[in-house]
Design a protein with these regions (language model features):
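N-terminal secretory signal peptides that target proteins for export/translocation
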Residues: 1-2
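Bacterial N-terminal signal peptides
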Residues: 5-17
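Short, surface-exposed beta-edge/turn micro-motifs
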Residues: 10, 89-91
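Blade/loop signatures of beta-propeller domains
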Residues: 22-58, 77
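Extracytoplasmic/lumenal domain signature
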Residues: 45-70, 83-88, 99-137, 145-186, ...
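General structural concept
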Residues: 74-80, 92-94, 102
Length: 517
């Protein structure tokens, strides 16, 4: 199975803060915590390495969310001090696959409001669940909310009709009429990012006939901008990552390559955004891009941006099983093929385009000693044992690296690998701990016995219940496991951590909250 893909990188004029967080209660306002997509909750104090063994299931809420293919929920957003008819509350706001949004009182687990979002397109709504497990007609982009301290908190969510909705987070009511952001219905968009009043997203896999591109909606001018020419699939689950200088980064999958025509498959691209126009600035293409395209080894992740020695360093990777570092000042060098660092092959010796290598997004954090860490989910076994490991990992797990200097150049040094996990989702770091869901999803695509592709129904039947793990961030040692408390698997659902609470949704429509009582 081949997916088209390319990757883009966009520069916004103003510098972007490394994170937007209130001075009061911790929040989680966007996919992977902040615009840089580092998934590092800097303000967690309640859950500690000393008490995490006492983590409990505080509540679970069974919703009536209708699944679409393998899709159910997106990553929850957690926001505090939100005015509701019942007073100020901390809410977990979760978008469901069928264009419904659920707001839950984090303290009690009670539903505060539910908002079914109306179909806005003139194109007809389909009755089914799309085709296969790829284009499932599902809401697929994690929403975003304006950060704490903003004059007005607004919850942005992109529905399957291609329209961007702007909701009051306290009531779910529309603040204004929805805006058409995508050219057609059922495009497959990923994690919304919001900086300087501009909402960005990317689309992938050609679903609904929507051009695979970078999209921007300027809330000040009310205009939508689209990068050109259309690329292959852009499908990092956390959407675009935005650097501290305003550059927007994302990766690509396979597609015909023609640099002169602007068709940059298996690449990272740079665009500037000014006056509601997106313009190509720079790009990086691995020197073995032809082989990556031939073997369907997409660059399929959302990269993470790390401020480092006076510039941003971008960490990327994908199915191939290698990781690379890019310099924001020149992401591919003069020939567009020279990264700061490219690792040896660390995974996917089987050249497996379905279940191995890295998928989703990364995490990055700095410990009290100033050591910069990078974490990545990985499918399948590694090609070598990391210095700290916990046995064989036939299904995969989490890989941890240190960003260090060697011979005057930055490198990623292997540090630890977790125990075995069935489909490790992107990790989250908080207070010296790594929170990760072993999603339990069966990720096979081609049915080698009967031929053709597995259907979504067949993949669902082969999946197993998810597990929540908490690891020591320095060593990868398991400090907590949820065991059999989660009844279903999850697909790209993601977890959020804030204020001593770990919240996520599963395929069967249940939203879970673990925490310290």
């Amino acid at each position: 199975m081949r997916y088209a893909g390319a990757a883009l990188l966009v520069a916004v004029v103003c510098a972007i803060p490394t994170f937007g967080q209130s001075a009061g209660q911790p929040e989680w306002t966007t996919s992977s915590y902040n615009p840089q997509r580092d998934a590092w909750q800097r303000h967690e104090e309640t859950i500690t390495p000393q008490n995490v063994a006492g983590l409990k299931l505080l509540w679970k809420l069974k919703t009536d969310n209708k699944t679409m293919g393998m899709q159910s929920f997106r990553e929850p957003l957690i926001v505090s001090g939100i005015g509701t008819p019942a007073g100020a509350k901390t809410l977990a706001i979760v978008a469901g696959s069928s264009n419904e949004v659920f707001a839950i009182d984090v303290a009690s687990g009670e539903l505060v409001w539910k908002k079914p979002l109306k179909w806005s397109s003139q194109q007809p709504q389909e009755a089914g669940e799309g085709r296969g497990f790829i284009c499932t007609n599902a809401l697929s982009a994690t929403p975003v909310i304006t950060p704490a301290g903003a004059k007005e908190r607004t919850f942005y969510v992109l529905t399957t009709d291609g329209y961007l909705h702007m909701l009051d987070p306290g009531t779910g009511e529309e603040r204004q009429a929805p805006v058409q952001m995508l050219s057609s219905v059922y495009g497959k968009a990923y994690g919304l990012n919001l900086v300087n009043g501009v909402v960005f997203t990317i689309t992938g896999q050609g679903c609904g006939g929507v051009a695979n591109a970078l999209y921007a909606y300027n809330t000040a001018t009310k205009k939508v901008s689209v990068s050109s020419p259309p690329q292959g699939g852009l499908w990092g689950v956390a959407g675009p990552a935005i650097g501290t200088d305003g550059t927007i980064y994302f990766e690509s999958g396979d597609h015909p390559y023609d640099a002169k025509a602007g068709l940059l498959s298996a690449s990272v691209q740079a665009y500037t955004f000014a006056n509601d126009t997106l313009t190509l600035k720079d790009y990086y293409t691995p020197s073995n891009y032809e082989w990556l395209n031939k073997r369907d080894l997409d660059l399929n992740t959302t990269p993470v941006v790390i401020p480092y020695q006076g510039r941003d360093v971008i960490v990327g990777g994908g199915k191939e099983g290698r990781f690379f570092l890019l310099d924001s000042k020149s992401i591919g060098g003069a020939d567009h093929e020279t990264p700061l660092f490219r690792s040896e092959l660390l995974a996917n010796a089987n050249v497996n385009f379905q279940t191995e290598g890295t998928w989703g997004s990364f995490a990055a954090w700095k410990d009290r000693g100033g050591v910069q860490w990078v974490l990545a989910p990985n499918g399948g076994p590694t090609t070598l044992k990391f210095p700290i490991n916990y046995g064989a990992t036939p299904n995969g797990g989490i890989l941890a690296f240190k960003l260090e200097e060697k011979n005057g150049k930055p490198v990623l040094s292997q540090a630890w690998q977790s125990g075995d996990m069935m489909t490790a989702e992107p990790p989250v770091v908080a207070n010296g701990l790594v929170f990760v869901l072993a999603g339990g999803e069966f990720t096979g695509q081609t049915n080698d016995v009967e031929g053709g592709l597995f259907s979504a129904e067949e993949r669902i039947k082969r999946s197993i219940p998810a597990k929540l793990f908490v690891l020591d961030a320095q060593t990868g040692k398991e400090l907590y496991s949820s065991g059999n408390q989660i009844a279903s698997f999850l697909h790209q659902a993601g977890l959020s951590v804030a204020g001593g609470r770990v919240i996520f949704g599963s395929f069967d429509g249940t939203i879970y909250c673990f925490g310290i009582k």
